[in-house]
């Protein structure tokens, strides 16, 4: 199903454009695990693909379902619910996040740790920063440097980088230096540098390609590299995104003159640059604005 907005209310259509769930929500989010988060007023709940309310809009905050559970908040307290809306886990924390690979990130004070699906803290809050697990590892911050832990909490890649991103397709982005002038590259899951820090910006791999920027934020150009760091689509775009279903949306021009189209993994133009706003292809369709 695809989200639509009509007269400030949101709902869903199918691939033929037929309305499946009328636009009756103040805010609707994409379906995850067959349920969609919705908002009415200041409260969140969940609906199924028939539009039936599964969890009434009663929570101040919700994370969305992941691995069958969603973190929710009411009256200043976080807990987890299952897809029937039943409470499954109580947790004492300042913030709770979705489950990934069997563990969920929590924030206690200023530190981050992880709980399991029984609500037991298995990695105690000790990191100044942390993200969700991906491919068996989570990026964490100790002091002012970033590294990775495994599912048992062991530091498997020491915190030596100024920034890192999640592992994707076996590689993780790292940065040496600050956000403005630092250089970016890739490491493998042992911490070995596969692509040295040489680009002005890089993004995680998707479908065997990673988006890179050569040049500064204002004047740089975007292209794509393979997993050895070889440029396979030369930096030529003023903006670009990752690949989805074999296509990536790319743009040339600035401001109101910017137009978006789509290229394949070889950089061949498949859809000419003509749109003012693009989105990823999902199940063969992409939402665009003319």
Question: Can you describe what each PLM-predicted range is?
Answer:
Residues 1-290:
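Residue-level detector of conserved, function-critical positions
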């Amino acid at each position: 199903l695809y989200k639509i907005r009509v007269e400030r209310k949101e709902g869903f259509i199918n691939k033929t454009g037929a309305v499946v769930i009328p636009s009756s929500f103040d805010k609707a989010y994409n379906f995850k695990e067959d349920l969609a988060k919705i908002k009415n007023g200041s409260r969140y709940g969940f609906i199924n693909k028939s539009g039936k309310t599964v969890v009434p809009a009663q929570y101040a905050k919700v994370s969305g379902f992941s691995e069958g559970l969603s973190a929710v908040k009411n009256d200043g307290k976080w807990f987890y619910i299952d897809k029937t809306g039943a409470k499954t886990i109580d947790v004492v924390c300042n913030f709770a996040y979705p489950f990934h690979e069997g563990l969920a990130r929590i924030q206690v004070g200023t530190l981050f740790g992880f709980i399991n699906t029984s609500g037991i803290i298995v990695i105690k809050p000790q990191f100044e920063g942390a993200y969700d697990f991906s491919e068996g590892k989570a990026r964490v911050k100790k002091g002012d440097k970033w590294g990775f832990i495994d599912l048992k909490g062991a530091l498997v890649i020491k915190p030596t980088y100024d920034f890192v991103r999640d592992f994707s397709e076996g590689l993780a982005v790292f940065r040496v230096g600050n956000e403005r002038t630092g250089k970016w590259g890739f490491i493998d899951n042992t911490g070995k540098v596969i692509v040295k820090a040489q680009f002005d910006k890089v993004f995680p791999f998707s479908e065997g390609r990673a988006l890179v920027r050569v040049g500064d934020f204002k004047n740089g150009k975007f292209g794509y590299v393979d997993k050895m760091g070889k440029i396979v689509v030369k930096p030529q775009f003023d903006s670009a995104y990752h690949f989805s279903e074999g296509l990536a949306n790319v743009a040339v021009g600035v401001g109101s003159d910017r137009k978006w189209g789509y290229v394949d993994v070889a950089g061949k133009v498949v859809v000419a640059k003509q749109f003012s706003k693009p989105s990823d292809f999902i199940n063969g369709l992409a939402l665009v604005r003319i």
